[in-house]
């Protein structure tokens, strides 16, 4: 019976991870804006989905570990907000980099892979409240290992879903060119860079506004 329940929890964590990538939020927007606005290919799409997931999972694990050893002296919510601000700043930097590359295409060669890794790490710095809640609940009940396992399974589901979306965006490029036209498509880097900057600003402003309202 216990094994059946654990299996159900694992399946639920996996499904929730997949669904999390489809929930309203900046994850999909960042992936779409970057891939459609740069020369990212299938390898870049897979790398982006994987990097976001690794960064996402590492941050949750870090917050969980910090909550164990520094529970009395550390406010996990404050660390969460700090991660959001740092992630937002990096997103803004990536957005500026995309726009700069568009405006000055001959000044330097665009390193797509470097941009993918930077973007993936920054987007993953904003922890998922649901996954963090599962880990903290497991810690409070003395089941740290179970919590880490469920978060890892959640992250696998997230990785599959995010990577699938990224690949879909790559494959849709040619379709967009066909129906929109190359002239308009050439403006995509300017649009995508602006969107990523706005998302970065929102990521920074969100925790600040929450504290201001409270």
Curated annotation (Swiss-Prot):
Its main location: membrane. The chain crosses the membrane at residues 2-22, 46-66, 79-99, 116-136, 149-169, 188-208. GO terms for molecular function: nickel cation transmembrane transporter activity. It is found in: Cell membrane. It is a multi-pass membrane protein. GO terms for biological process: cobalt ion transport; response to cobalt ion; response to nickel cation. Keywords: Cell membrane, Cobalt, Cobalt transport, Ion transport, Membrane, Nickel, Nickel transport, Transmembrane, Transmembrane helix, Transport. InterPro entries: NiCoT_RcnA, UreH-like_TM_dom. GO terms for cellular component: plasma membrane. Belongs to the NiCoT transporter (TC 2.A.52) family. Efflux system for nickel and cobalt. This is Putative nickel/cobalt efflux system MJ1092. It comes from Methanocaldococcus jannaschii (strain ATCC 43067 / DSM 2661 / JAL-1 / JCM 10045 / NBRC 100440).
């Amino acid at each position: 019976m216990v094994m059946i329940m654990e299996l159900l929890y694992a399946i639920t964590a996996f499904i929730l991870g997949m669904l999390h990538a489809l929930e309203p939020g900046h994850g999909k927007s960042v992936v779409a804006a970057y891939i459609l606005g740069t020369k990212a290919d299938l390898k870049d799409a897979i790398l982006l989905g994987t990097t976001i997931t690794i960064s996402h999972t590492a941050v949750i694990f870090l917050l969980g570990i910090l909550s164990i050893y520094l529970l009395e002296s550390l406010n996990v919510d404050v660390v969460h907000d700090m991660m959001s601000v740092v992630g937002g700043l990096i997103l803004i930097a990536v957005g500026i980099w995309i726009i700069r590359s568009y405006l000055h295409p001959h000044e330097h060669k665009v390193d797509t892979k470097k941009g993918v890794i930077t973007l993936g790490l920054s987007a993953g710095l904003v922890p998922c409240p649901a996954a963090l809640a599962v880990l903290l609940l497991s810690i409070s009940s003395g089941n740290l290992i179970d919590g880490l396992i469920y978060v890892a399974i959640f992250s696998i589901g997230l990785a599959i879903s995010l990577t699938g979306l990224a690949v879909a965006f790559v494959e849709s490029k040619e379709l967009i060119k066909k129906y929109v036209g190359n002239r308009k498509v050439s403006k995509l880097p300017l649009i995508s860079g602006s969107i990523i900057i706005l998302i970065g600003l929102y990521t920074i402003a969100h925790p600040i506004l929450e504290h201001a309202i409270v």
